[in-house]
Amino acid sequence: MSVSAFNRRWAAVILEALTRHGVRHICIAPGSRSTPLTLAAAENSTFIHHTHFDERGLGHLALGLAKVSKQPVAVIVTSGTAVANLYPALIEAGLTGEKLILLTADRPPELIDCGANQAIRQPGMFASHPTHSISLPRPTQDIPARWLVSTIDHALGTLHVGGVHINCPFAEPLYGEMDDTGLSWQQRLGDWWQDDKPWLREAPRLESEKQRDWFFWRQKRGVVVAGRMSAEEGKKVALWAQTLGWPLIGDVLSQTGQPLPCADLWLGNAKATSELQQAQIVVQLGSSLTGKRLLQWQASCEPEEYWIVDDIEGRLDPAHHRGRRLIANIADWLELHPAEKRQPWCVEIPRLAEQAMQAVIARRDAFGEAQLAHRICDYLPEQGQLFVGNSLVVRLIDALSQLPAGYPVYSNRGASGIDGLLSTAAGVQRASGKPTLAIVGDLSALYDLNALALLRQVSAPLVLIVVNNNGGQIFSLLPTPQSERERFYLMPQNVHFEHAAAMFELKYHRPQNWQELETAFADAWRTPTTTVIEMVVNDTDGAQTLQQLLAQVSHL
């Protein structure tokens, strides 16, 4: 009996089972213990294979692929700390709804806790963050193949969002020629190998039912808050709110067109919050709100009813409103709850939104971070997509820009970390094949710098804007101690990215004005390669401009 041959047959059943649940993209890191999984994936023609040498980046690459494809994405890594590097992406997926399947190779039980190399306690290491965790036994013909495939089917068939951790111990030898070992074991699955359906099919979960009193509430004064959603959902939500005559407060990730732009500016005006107090119902569609003033208003508002609609399960309201938590696909929910044509009830807010936008436009000429955030719509590629980083840049775009309705926008706004942003953007581009504009800060770019290796492989033009404000300038907006702000919060690194781009053979520009930036974009969109555009700005101008605009709009 060949141990290596049976390891591969065992792994082949696992990998084939994944294909029955829509897995097409599979991300693989180098490693020896994961050889059975890697070879099984390589031999399965259903998969699109992605590789990366850094497991943390690999996890975020899978996250980006899952964001766009809306399908589960598998990741294969070897044993040891390689597994731990998947933690950040797993956490983000659980909060933002992507499906990740983590196949982690492991040493067999007799090599754990005895000083063996690269052997750690992997079962349960992700605590409660996976939706399902499976600790498989060492491959053995004593366990029927139907147990293995039905175990995988159960986990994936009941997976709605988040990750599945499948820990896979393999004994040595890991290498060797294939023989007939385990062939009859594998063949007991019969015509399943020629089929394309799961061995075990789980019934789909029930969606939220229609709210029977919706016809009552839609006649009231309402407010629509739009969080993260798909481009198609964003367009539908905008039309729905317009028909109802309800003001729509759209987040940067809502893709609604933000019909009342600069919400995070005008929500700081007492006239706006006073008018919003008249709302009898607030319907929040989608989660992960960005703006500070929006979050403050959301926490303080007290309508008669506060409804949250999202297909992610669990509590999504940090303000703990009285109301309803409705688990449903947003587009499906809108269809069940049609709008009735009514006149807008808000008068003051549209005026304030227009005045806030004019205040932003009046400052657009200076070459700076805040101005770039406002102008970002001018640089979006046709039939493309936008990936927005975290920290200051996403807040500036949210407050100062007005993204077009239905234009795809992606971000990691679950745990809102700055780790893995470039890797996620790479996955977003690969899954869609669209021209992509990604924008991050300098510390975010440094944090995931080796992901520039992933950006060498793109199928359409990708522009990475690195806004270099020399540190974490988001802390300039917070009451951090002035005496220790630079040393312990901002942490300026005094670096530039020209040599990093050169190391990975990426095109690079460092424009000094708007004309040079536009020229760089025109050049970048011509070829299916990655271009790094480093925009060096004054350290504090972005944060200061936002604070000045907040003060100005609050007194309108």
From Swiss-Prot:
Gene Ontology molecular function, alphabetical: 2-succinyl-5-enolpyruvyl-6-hydroxy-3-cyclohexene-1-carboxylic-acid synthase activity; magnesium ion binding; manganese ion binding; thiamine pyrophosphate binding
Pathway(s): Quinol/quinone metabolism; 1,4-dihydroxy-2-naphthoate biosynthesis; 1,4-dihydroxy-2-naphthoate from chorismate: step 2/7; Quinol/quinone metabolism; menaquinone biosynthesis
Listed EC numbers: 2.2.1.9
Top-level EC class: transferase
Cofactor: how and how many bound: Binds 1 thiamine pyrophosphate per subunit.
Subunit structure comment from the entry: Homodimer.
Protein name according to UniProt: 2-succinyl-5-enolpyruvyl-6-hydroxy-3-cyclohexene-1-carboxylate synthase
